[in-house]
Structure formats: C-alpha cells, structure tokens
C-alpha cells in the first residue's frame, strides 16, 4: 500500500470514528479467543501428513500480549533438524513470521469462537493455508494445512494437538 493509500485509509477511519453516532463506533478487530492461549503438544499418533513425513515432536505456545498473540512453534524432524518459528499477530492484517524460510508472513482470519484460518505467504505469494479448530472442551486442537504445488505433490496435513498447559510453565 502506497503512502497516499495509507493516508486515505487513516483519514477514512478517523472520519468514520468521529462521525458515527455514540454507541455505534466502527467495530474493533475481533479479539483473539482465550481458548488458544496455552501450550499445545503434537499428538503424532492421531496426525496425518501427506505426502509426509511430519515432525516427530512439536510444541505450540500461544501467549497473549495486549490484544495480540505471540505464537512460538518448536519442531523436531526425523533427521534431527529443529525449527523454531515465532510471530506476533492479530486478525485481519498481515504480520511477519521469523524462523522459517518457507513463509515470511501470516494473515489470520477469525471464523468463529473456536475456529480461525491463516494464510501463510512468502514474498507476497501464498505458500499455504491453515485452518485451526479448538475443541469445545478446550483440551485439543486440530490444524488442517493445505498447499497446492505447481511443481510437485500438493500438501494436505491434518495435525492434532493436546493442551498440556493453560499458561507457559504451568501444568494443565
């Protein structure tokens, strides 16, 4: 977005906020669900990776930071390689991702209280999409990842996680 477009958007938002009748202000971005905050561990026995193989260990830690969430993903692969991916994000905007060469940005979209989608991109091109669903009992989470490859097999992973702590450093 260019400077002129950015200024126009800021002016439009400021105008809408000051001219809306009291009690009818523009809606704030959706808040991140409390269900997400905590530590989640890969349940490899329930997970499926196509074409595979997936990581042998993975822990996802989600921490609330103001209105945003900090996501920390730590993985160990069968060949011993380790990966640590980090991002701070909220809904409806693109945020930078660190720790992987596969994608450099994430855009989150809230579907409902327990479901959200993420578009992962690299250099402005979509790398893949992930749909995260937290179970109603808040004890498990499923992430379905899809990526269409132009040169090789497409990717379709259904990955299950068990909540192991409500907050980092605390048992469930």
Model segments located where?
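Bacterial N-terminal signal peptides
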Residues: 8-17
């Amino acid at each position: 977005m260019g400077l002129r477009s950015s200024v126009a958007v800021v002016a439009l938002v400021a105008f809408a906020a000051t001219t809306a009748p009291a009690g009818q202000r523009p809606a704030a971005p959706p808040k991140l669900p409390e269900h997400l905050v905590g530590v989640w561990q890969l349940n490899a026995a329930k997970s499926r990776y196509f074409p595979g193989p997936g990581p042998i260990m993975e822990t996802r830690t989600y921490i609330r930071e103001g209105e945003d969430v900090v996501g920390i993903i730590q993985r160990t692969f069968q060949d011993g390689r380790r990966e640590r991916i980090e991002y701070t994000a909220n809904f409806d905007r693109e945020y930078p991702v660190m720790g992987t060469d596969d994608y450099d940005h994430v855009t989150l979209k809230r579907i409902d209280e327990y479901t959200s989608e993420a578009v992962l991109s690299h250099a402005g091109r979509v790398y893949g999409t992930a749909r995260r669903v937290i179970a109603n009992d808040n004890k498990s989470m499923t992430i379905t990842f899809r990526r269409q490859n132009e040169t090789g097999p497409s990717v379709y992973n259904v990955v299950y996680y068990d909540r192991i702590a409500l907050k980092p450093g605390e048992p469930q």
